[in-house]
Amino acid sequence: MPEAVIVSTARSPIGRAFKGSLKDLRPDDLTATIIQAALAKVPELDPRDIDDLMLGCGLPGGEQGNNLGRIVAVQMGMDHLPGCTITRYCSSSLQTSRMALHAIKAGEGDVFISAGVEMVSRFTKGNSDSLPDTHNPFFAEAEARTAEVAQQEGTTWHDPRKDGLVPDAYIAMGQTAENLARWKGVTRQDMDEFGVRSQNLAEEAIKNGFWEREITPVTLPDGTVVSKDDGPRAGVTLEGVQGLKPVFRPDGLVTAGNCCPLNDGAAAVVIMSDTKARELGLTPLARIVSTGVSGLSPEIMGLGPVEASQQALRRAGLSIDDIDLVEINEAFAAQVIPSYRDLGIPLEKLNVNGGAIAVGHPFGMTGARITGTLINSLQFHDKQFGLETMCVGGGQGMAMVIERLS
């Protein structure tokens, strides 16, 4: 059975939504640029040998609609290349990598592009398609319950299923973070310290050249070249973030200092069978060892990485002690903290260059972005095995184990 190996990665800088460096770019234009950058790193590959372009997008509507994956293929002049657009919210472009892994293992193709994009700046009225009243009335009572809790103080999460009630499948991510923090005993101090850690580590990684190794500079319509992420801030202190006000509840724990912002960006990963890589004379960057995906209550979705990671580790025949570096997407400190604690991950292995609290989280981009970052980190720190994992809106988790090969 062939192995699935990663031969190239590329990503854009990450912009702040609505006010950042990439706000004037279309998602299809940026995605095409980044996929072409990833392909340029493997000139031995004939584009006609690519079996499929699978594009992850958290909210595929508006400019991100119309099967964006296929739009991008045609835009790049590859009419021969099939394209699809996949959403699993925050893990959309980890899902596309999983699909490439499965296709290669099944013998149904040798070369795949797994890419991801999210351009929140291009959303209208807060969502990608701007259509009103699309929620199913089946969840109306659950949504009303969430709204009521959001106005209360001192509320600890209780599983509605225990009362025969339906959970809120549309719950805002910030409310899930508040639920999880209280349910798992995570304090505001814990969260603020983690947020500062992310920013400080990202600042240090910028200084030592880590981030520039993986960023593809992007040229804006006015000719400006963007080569750095908008998010990382120098000199962030605990005292500074402790003064920030809660965002989601009157007595809330989540602030702008301990969660990710809204962002724009795109990333791409070129995945092929090990037999095809040998045929082309390529030395792969990494091998995809295993993946996992989990489901749990939408109201505490942030704990999704735990079961998903346990699945991936079991399938890899590894324990968490065998993993050298871990990347947990930092949607909220409120969910990273209980996830790494439950998994038994030492802090010195976790998000060692900072994470999404600092660099950002464009939903559809993040899966592919973290894959590239993890490979970069395994190379930079000379390590072998890495675990990528994230929580997913709607109450899911996803994970992937990779082994560095070069």
Identify the meaning behind each predicted range.
Residues 55, 175-178, 216, 221, ...:
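Active-site pocket-lining segment
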Residues 1-58, 62-72, 76, 176-188, ...:
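Conserved active-site "lid/cap" helical segment
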Residues 111-179:
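Flexible glycine-/small-residue-enriched beta->alpha junction loops
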Residues 11-13, 24-33, 44, 152-154, ...:
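N-terminal extracellular/periplasmic Venus flytrap/periplasmic-binding protein-like
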Residues 1-27, 150-156, 163, 239-303, ...:
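Condensing-enzyme catalytic core mediating Claisen C-C bond formation in acyl metabolism
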Residues 47-56, 84-88, 112-116, 190-197, ...:
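Beta-strand segments within the central parallel beta-sheet cores of soluble alpha/beta enzyme folds
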Residues 25, 57-112, 152, 168-171, ...:
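Conserved catalytic cysteine-centered active-site region
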